[in-house]
A protein has these predicted regions:
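Catalytic domains of carbohydrate-active enzymes, especially glycoside hydrolases
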Residues: 1-19, 52, 149-165
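Substrate-binding surface in catalytic domains of secreted glycosidases
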Residues: 19-111
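Extracellular/periplasmic catalytic domains that process cell-envelope and extracellular macromolecules
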Residues: 46-47, 75, 131-133, 155-156
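Short, surface-exposed beta-strand/loop "edge" segments at domain boundaries and coil↔beta transitions
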Residues: 48, 136-138, 172
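Glycan-binding loop/region signatures in secreted carbohydrate-active enzymes
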Residues: 79-149
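Short, loop-centered acidic/histidine patches that primarily coordinate divalent metals
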Residues: 144, 165-167
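Aromatic-rich peripheral "rim/lid" segments of glycoside hydrolase catalytic domains that contact
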Residues: 167-178
Length: 178
């Protein structure tokens, strides 16, 4: 099973970054008894009371400080792990679903060339707009500075853990680790 495989490989943590309530509920007790940490998607926090809770910092609406503060109240800052997903999304305006199209490095570079880029304190991300086919588009993006700001905000709120993924953050690791 999972516990035996974690022991064999000397893993200290199991991360379930997607909503999977049945899975996290089934893993919670065996992992806890074995001294192996469990990190779960915030929608599954109720299924694993001793687990750390992954809270995504990539927002397309709302206010990051309000969101993280609400999560601290709901779960406790000591349980939270910032899921520092690197945002690179292209949205139509208006965008009632809040769902954008992920951009590759090459697509983002082509779109942002020659454009003025702004910082949104509320979203904790950079953005710019452009027009295509008579439609206004909105691009949200994270870089080393924006992720560093999100980490600093988390620290101010008492959140001392974060998760970065590779390869999406490989080019900005130096910006984040100093």
């Amino acid at each position: 099973g999972v516990v035996q495989e974690c022991r064999r490989r000397r893993y200290g943590t199991v991360i379930v970054p997607f909503p999977a309530a049945e899975l996290t509920e089934a893993l919670a007790q065996p992992l806890h008894r074995s001294g192996i940490a469990l990190w779960v998607h915030e929608k599954c926090a109720h299924t694993a009371p001793g687990a750390r809770v992954l809270v995504c910092t990539a927002l397309s609406g709302g206010d990051i400080e309000n969101r993280l503060s609400a999560c601290c109240r709901a779960f406790g800052a000591d349980r939270i792990v910032l899921d520092l997903q690197r945002l690179r999304m292209d949205f139509p305006l208006p965008c009632p679903t809040g769902e954008g199209i992920p951009l590759t490095d090459e697509q983002l570079a082509a779109l942002q060339t020659g454009r003025q880029i702004f910082f949104s304190r509320e979203l904790g991300a950079r953005y710019f707009t452009y027009r295509r086919g008579g439609e206004t588009r909105f691009v949200l993006l994270d870089d080393g500075d924006t992720l560093h700001r999100k980490i600093a905000l988390g620290e101010r709120l008492g959140i001392h853990r974060g998760l970065l993924t590779l390869p999406e953050c490989a080019d900005i690791l130096r910006d984040l680790t100093g």
